[in-house]
C-alpha cells in the first residue's frame, strides 16, 4: 500500500518536482528481462520464417501431389489399359471348317515341315492367316510324334516281350523244375541220392539192348578179330579143344558178368551200365588174351584170380 501511495503521489506531483529517473545500473533487471525477451523474438521470427519457409514446401508438396494424382490417374489409365492389353494378348480359339481341315491334313501328309511360302499359299487356299497355319502345323506335328511314340511302346509291350518271356524263366521256376529248393540243401548233403536215381539224358536215351549190342559176345569178338579164312582149327600150333575151352570159359564169364543178378549195382537200365559194360569187355578181352597166351605155352600156369568174374574184379 505504501508503494502504491508513493506511486500515486509521484504521479500527482508536477513534472518539475518529480525526482529524476533512477541510474542506468538499476535498470539491469529490466534490460535483462528485455534481453531475455529479445532472444525469443528471433525464435518467433525463426518459427515464422520456418512456417514461411514451409509454405513453399507445402506448395511443393501440393505440386508434388499433383504428379501423384497424375500418377494415380496414369495408374488408373494403366489399370484401365491392362485389361485391354490382356484382351489383346489373349488368343481367340480358331474353329476350322471341315474343308480347311481336309486341306491342311492333305498338305500335312505330303509335307510335315512346310516353309514360309507354302504356308502362305495354304493360308490363301483356306482363308486363314499364316500364323494360324504355322501354329496348326506345329500342333499337328506334336500330335503325330506322340502317336508314333505310343505305337512303338505298344509294339514293345505286345510283340517282343511275350516272345522272350517264354524263353526266359524265373529262377524259382527253374529250381522248382529241377527239383531243388532252398531248404533241403542240408538234407541232400547228409543223405546223398543213390546212383540209380540220378538222371542223365544221354545215357537214359540209350536202351540196355543198344548198350549190350555195342559190346558183343566173345564168339562174335573172336570172329571179328580173326579173319574169315581162319577157323578154330586153322591156328597153327593150337588144338581145337583149347579154343573150344577158351570160348566156353570166356562166354560163361561174360554172360555171368553181363547178367543182372551177378552184379549188386542195379538193373542194366541204370545209366552206369555202359561204364560197367566197358569194364567187363576190357576185362574179358584181357582174360581172353591171357588164355590165348596160356594155351600157346603156359597152360600149366594159371593165375589165382582167373576164376573171378567181372563184378568181383570191380569190388
From Swiss-Prot:
For this UniProt record, the keywords arranged alphabetically read as follows: Acetylation, Activator, Developmental protein, DNA-binding, Homeobox, Nucleus, Phosphoprotein, Transcription, Transcription regulation
Q: Where is this region: Disordered?
A: 1-103
| Gene Ontology MF annotations | DNA-binding transcription activator activity, RNA polymerase II-specific; DNA-binding transcription factor activity; DNA-binding transcription factor activity, RNA polymerase II-specific; RNA polymerase II cis-regulatory region sequence-specific DNA binding; RNA polymerase II-specific DNA-binding transcription factor binding; sequence-specific double-stranded DNA binding
Chain residues forming the annotated DNA-binding region: 89-148
Show where the record puts the motif OAR: 281-294
From the UniProt record, give one GO term of the biological process aspect: negative regulation of DNA-templated transcription
InterPro entries, per database record: HD, Homeobox_CS, Homeobox_Pitx/unc30, Homeodomain-like_sf, OAR_dom
Enumerate the subcellular locations listed in this protein's record, separating them with semicolons.
Answer: Nucleus
Recorded hits in Pfam families, A to Z, give: Homeodomain (PF00046), OAR (PF03826)
Q: Which residues carry this modification: Phosphoserine?
A: 46, 48
Q: Which residues carry this modification: N-acetylmethionine?
A: 1
Task: Region Interaction with PIT-1: list its residue ranges.
Answer: 149-280
- Principal subcellular localization: nucleus
Q: Where is the composition biased (Basic and acidic residues)?
A: 55-68
What's the domain of life for this entry?
A: Eukaryota
**Residue interval(s) of motif Nuclear localization signal:** 287-291
Known CDD domains for this protein?
homeodomain
> Spans of biased composition, class Basic residues?
85-94
What span is annotated as the signal peptide, if there is one? none
Briefly, what is this protein's role? Sequence-specific transcription factor that binds gene promoters and activates their transcription. May play a role in the development of anterior structures, and in particular, the brain and facies and in specifying the identity or structure of hindlimb.
- Subunit description: Interacts with POU1F1.
Q: What is this protein called?
A: Pituitary homeobox 1
Species of origin reads Rattus norvegicus (Rat)
Q: Which gene encodes it?
A: Pitx1
Amino acid at each position: 500500500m505504501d508503494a502504491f501511495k508513493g506511486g500515486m503521489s509521484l504521479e500527482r506531483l508536477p513534472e518539475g518536482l518529480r525526482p529524476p529517473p533512477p541510474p542506468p545500473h538499476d535498470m539491469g533487471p529490466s534490460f535483462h528481462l528485455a534481453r531475455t525477451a529479445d532472444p525469443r523474438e528471433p525464435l518467433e521470427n525463426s518459427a515464422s520464417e520456418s512456417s514461411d519457409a514451409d509454405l513453399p514446401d507445402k506448395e511443393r508438396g501440393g505440386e508434388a501431389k499433383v504428379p501423384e494424382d497424375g500418377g494415380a490417374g496414369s495408374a488408373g489409365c494403366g489399370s484401365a489399359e491392362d485389361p485391354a492389353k490382356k484382351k489383346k494378348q489373349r488368343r481367340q480359339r480358331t474353329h476350322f471348317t471341315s474343308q480347311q481341315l481336309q486341306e491342311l491334313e492333305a498338305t500335312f501328309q505330303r509335307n510335315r515341315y512346310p516353309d514360309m511360302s507354302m504356308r502362305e499359299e495354304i493360308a490363301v487356299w483356306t482363308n486363314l492367316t499364316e500364323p494360324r497355319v504355322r501354329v496348326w502345323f506345329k500342333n499337328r506335328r506334336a500330335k503325330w510324334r506322340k502317336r508314333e511314340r505310343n505305337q512303338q511302346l505298344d509294339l514293345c509291350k505286345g510283340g517282343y516281350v511275350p516272345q522272350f518271356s517264354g524263353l526266359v524263366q524265373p529262377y524259382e521256376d527253374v529250381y522248382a523244375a529241377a527239383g531243388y529248393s532252398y531248404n533241403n540243401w542240408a538234407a541232400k548233403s547228409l543223405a546223398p541220392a543213390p546212383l540209380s536215381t540220378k538222371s542223365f539224358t544221354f545215357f537214359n536215351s540209350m536202351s540196355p539192348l543198344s548198350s549190350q549190342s555195342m559190346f558183343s559176345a566173345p564168339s562174335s569178338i573172336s570172329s571179328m578179330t580173326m579173319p574169315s579164312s581162319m577157323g578154330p582149327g586153322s591156328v597153327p600150333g593150337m588144338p581145337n579143344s583149347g579154343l573150344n575151352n577158351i570160348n566156353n570159359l570166356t562166354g560163361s564169364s561174360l554172360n555171368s558178368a553181363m547178367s543182372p543178378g551177378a552184379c549188386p549195382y542195379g538193373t542194366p537200365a541204370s545209366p552206369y551200365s555202359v561204364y560197367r559194360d566197358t569194364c567187363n569187355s576190357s576185362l574179358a578181352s584181357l582174360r581172353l588174351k591171357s588164355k590165348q597166351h596160356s594155351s600157346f605155352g603156359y597152360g600149366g600156369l594159371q593165375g589165382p584170380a582167373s576164376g573171378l568174374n567181372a563184378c568181383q574184379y570191380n569190388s
